[in-house]
Structure formats: structure tokens, C-alpha cells
Amino acid sequence: MLMWNPSKLTTAGKALLAKAQAGQTSIQITKAQTGSGSYSSGENIESRTALKTPKQTFPIQNKVISDADSTVILKIAITNKSESETLSTGYDITEFGIFAQDPQKGEILYSIATASTSDYMPAYNGVLPSVINMSYYLEVSNAENVTINSAGALALQADLEALEARVTTIEKNKVELLGVRRKVDASSYAWERIGDAVGMVCKAAVGNGTVQNDMMSHYPFSEMRPCNLAEDRTVNAYLGDATFQWDGTNGDVMLEVPMTYTGRWFETDADGVKWEYRAISSAQIGHLHLDHLFTDGADRRISEKVYLPIFPGSIEHIESSTQSEEVSVRSVAVDVLRSRAGYMPAHNKTCGQFRILCKTKGDNWYLDDVWAMHFLDTCYIVMFANTHAQGTLGPGRTEFPEDGTKGLALQERTGNYITVAKDYGNRFAIGQGISIGNGLWSQSLAADRLVTKIEDSTEVENAVCVYFDGDPVAITTTSVLWSSVQPTGATIGMASPNGRVEGKTPGMSAIRFLWIEDWYGNIWQFRDGDNIQKYQHYYCNDRSAYADKVYNGSYFKVGYVAGTAEGYVKTFGYDPEWSEIEICTENGASSNTYFCDYYYAAEGGEVVISGGSVLRGAGSGPFSRHCSNSAGASIWYFGGRPQARK
């Protein structure tokens, strides 16, 4: 086990510290370095200007201010495999240095430590990186004024400091690499577990029972928690607290997600077989980087926690106070998008309109985006080691009755029920959402009603009467009964965070993944942060800059062009700079091969919508992308969800 003697400030480091104490400069940490140099007992290491035998250089992951204002704790992951370097020859780690920028001298060795007990860093074996997670205590003049270079980018301390709670969480657990891999050319949806995920059993539940899921006790899943979030982003309660509420009365129902490192990369083995890898961890090891769900803005501000919506968004009308020249204070009604159980999802709005409904909630509220979509995809693949979510979690709410002929009313009346063919009407379920209109998918007569009863007709042979709530409706023989969006909250009785409820049929049963209901199915979800122009996707990692039909500035061009034909996803493109981005470049798979979900594309497509709806069936799933609609598209099966950040 690697153990260190007390670290020392070098002579140059002391001089820089004196300048900082005199207010002439601040301490800017640039990098860390390991080496294999030998030191004799009592050797004066303070005079060193470099390590004796430097071997590897690493960025500083983040820093924490200790109880002493003049000390910071630097976090460094020493590994034999990073995005920029692969260690080909192993060595004994015997020396360690921290470098800083001196305004007169340039980069200097600021602090040095020698090992009392060395540790061997092996060469990378081509499968699993070795990592030593290190905390280095460093003397500075004022910890608040220290900046660090992280992965080559300068960031303010306020953006990169890890709160003590997170440090405690990570350091009490072994840094793990939970990973999977698949042969790129193999059509199977199954992946092979690697790293610390080997041997884990992960199952999804059906109904309200519990099942074995080993990964839920490992970071980051062990630290994900449903919560009630106020509009100022204060957590009012966590699931299990006496005050926690699913219905939104104590705040939006959100999933608190801790800062997580993810990776997606490709390697070819000695036999010439190309593999795709996915992995997650609490630390920056191997090919992993801080997932871009947690970064924001041109300076890559870091959010220690992100809050993802558990339910499709529903609209709440609230009273807001405002001030004008004529009236000092007045009340104004505004609409906001809420994540809560027991409501019909909002729909028939454009992506831009959903964006406004989210931003109206306050600072750091946004429309849920492509970064959350990609992050959850990786979490699913790592947890269940496959890309067939419908086969694992269930079909989702994707197979509801929709028929413009069988759904025609067989009797005219004004009331709260419609008479339809028995074989069609009996496919509906009590409590499900329906609409009635002059034709299939028309809501001209009744929108988003709930079925209250289904019984045989006493007046029409081979027919049933489907009763619904709300005001009476004038039914004619041109009226059509069909399944529209479904109310939220179907999964709140489940004990397991992953799986499906026991509905009338599997295809009418809501699924949840990490407590997130209707992750696919029920209603398509707009995903902000990605604008499309003639199959070229432009991404944005600055949420304040999200806008429709923008292709420059904060939006950057993804390093490949999307596929031009629709079909089941066979291949996602790969941009090494933004490795988590998954855009279909090749179809030709099926509902049970490769990625198992359907991709829609058209030359005029401008926005991204994910998941599927009540009528999309086997093509639905987390990897299904609807990229064929304009920014002005709005329809009954397009919805959105609010996302929040610390």
C-alpha cells in the first residue's frame, strides 16, 4: 500500500507562498506528477526543482477546503490508463510533486513528497485500468483564492470544490469501475460485464415486490435519491421522510443524482475484434471523464448534484407577484412545468414553449436535455448489461388501443359513456387516459379523460359502454374513442426503483428506471440542447443558451452526420471529444438486435424527442430518437420535463 512521508514545500514553493501572503499573486495549481526516483534518509528534498525520475503527469480532479483556511485537499486519480496516456511500462511510485505557476518564474515544483512505502503501478493490461485515488494536503496562503488546472482547463475554486459530504461518500467506498463491453460487429443486445461489475446480478421487478439488484448498493446508484425539490432548488424531503409527497405538494418530485464520471470508448483486441466499452465511477480513471450532465457553460461550471424529473411534466397555474409603475404589487397568473404524480402530462406544445415553462420556475431550471438522456442510457447499459430495455424493464406504456374503425361510437347520446365494439372496448382499463373526437387522434369532443367503468351494453349486441369522468359529451356515430396520454404516478407503489407495474397487459404497464416513470412510453419527451440541420446535429453544453434553430455560438457541430434513413438502431456515431453523444448513423437492426429501438429521421428534422408513446410499441425505448420534426412541432404525444441543477 502506498504511504507517504510528510510533504514539503520546495524553496520555490515557499517563495511563491510568500508572494501570495503579501497579496502579490494567487496560487494557481497546474498539475501533479509521479516518479520513481530514489531518496536517501534525511535528504533535503526542499531544494528540488523537479522530480528525480518523473513517470506520469495528471490533472487535479478537484479540491476541498480543509478546516484550516490555509490548507486545501487536492484530489488526484493516479492511473495507468487515461484519455491522453497509456502506461506501457510499470514502475514503483516513490515520489510525488505538485506544480504551480509563478508569475515571474513560470511553472515550478511547489510541493514534493517521498514514499515511506512505495506501490507498483503496472502497465495497462488492455482490459481494466489500475487506479490509486489520492488526497494531497497542500499549504497555501488562502484556500479560497486557489485555482487549479483540471484536465487542462482553468476553473474557479467555487466551481470545482467538492463539498465535504460528497468527499465523505466517495472516500468511504472503494473507487470502483463499473463497466460493460460488447463486440461491435455482434448483433446481440447482451453486453459483458467488466471491472468491479463482474459477477453482479441486476434484476428488474414486476409489481410491488423486491428483486436482487447488486448495483443499487454501489456508487453512483447508492447515492441517487427521489426527493421533493423547491423552486429555489432546496430539498424539502427525501423518499422515506415523513414529509415526502409524490403529488408535488411539497415540491417537484425529482431524482437527486451525484456527480459521476462516465466513459464510452472503443478498443481492438489482439485478435482484431473491436469492442465498445461503457463505464461509470466516482473518479476520473481510465477513459472516464466527468459526465457533461454535470458541466455547464463556456467555463464548464460543475454542478455537484443534478435533479432529474421522475414524472412527465404537467402544468400548474400559479400566482406570481410583480411590480409596475401603475401598481406597486399585483398578482399575475403564470404557468410552470411540474414533475408530480396524479396529473395528466402536458402536451400540444412546442419544444420552445416547454423550455419557457421550465425557465419560469426560476434560476437553474431547464427543460430536460440530451445530456440527461445520454447519462441515463449509460447507467442502464452498465446496470443491466444489455440494450434491450423493453425486454428487461417491460414494454412500457406503448401498446394501448388505437383504432379509428373499431373505436367508432355505435350509439348517439349525450352523457359520460361511449358505446363501442366489445373486442375493442374491453382492451381499455379503468383509470387509463382516453380522448374522443371526430376521428382517430382528435380531441375535439373530450381530451384527457379517465375511464371510470367498463360494462356490457344492454342495448347494442357485442358492445361495451366505456364510462369516463368530466363533463357529459355529445356522442355521434362519427365519434372515435382512443387512448391518449396516461396520468402520472402509476409506479409510486413499487418497492423497486427498476421494473414495471402489473397492469392490464405488459404493454399497458408503466415502467420505471431509477424511479423515473415512463422513461420510455406514454409520451415522447423533448430533449433540449440539440438542434438539427439537414441531419447534422449541433449540441450545446450551456443551458442558459438553449434556443431553437441555433447552429453557432454556444452550439457546436458534432463530429459526424446522423443517418438519413429511419429504422432500428444498429450503430451510434462516436465523437471522441464528446464521447457520450449517441446519434444513430446506421440502421438495419431489429426490435431484439443491437440497440433494439427505432430511429426516425427526415431532412427537415430540427429537434430531438426520445422514448416513445402509447402507440409506438416495440420501437419504443431509451435509445429511440424522433429526429424528423421541426422546432414548431406540437402534438398530443409530445411532452417535456423540468430539470434542475445545484
Predicted regions and their residues:
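N-terminal assembly/attachment segments of tailed bacteriophage virion structural proteins
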Residues: 1-150
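Acidic glycine-/aspartate-rich tracts in secreted/extracellular proteins
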Residues: 38-39, 103-105, 260-262, 313-314, ...
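Beta-strand-rich solenoidal segments
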Residues: 85-162, 260-269, 273-302, 311-322, ...
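Extended alpha-helical stalk/coiled-coil segments
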Residues: 158-172
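GGW-centered surface loops in extracellular recognition modules
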Residues: 171-256, 262-264, 365, 473-475
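Short aromatic-cysteine micro-motif
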Residues: 248-251, 282-444, 448, 454-519
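C-terminal, surface-exposed recognition/capping segments
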Residues: 371-374, 378, 396, 522-532, ...
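A short, polar/charged loop-to-alpha-helix boundary motif
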Residues: 533-544
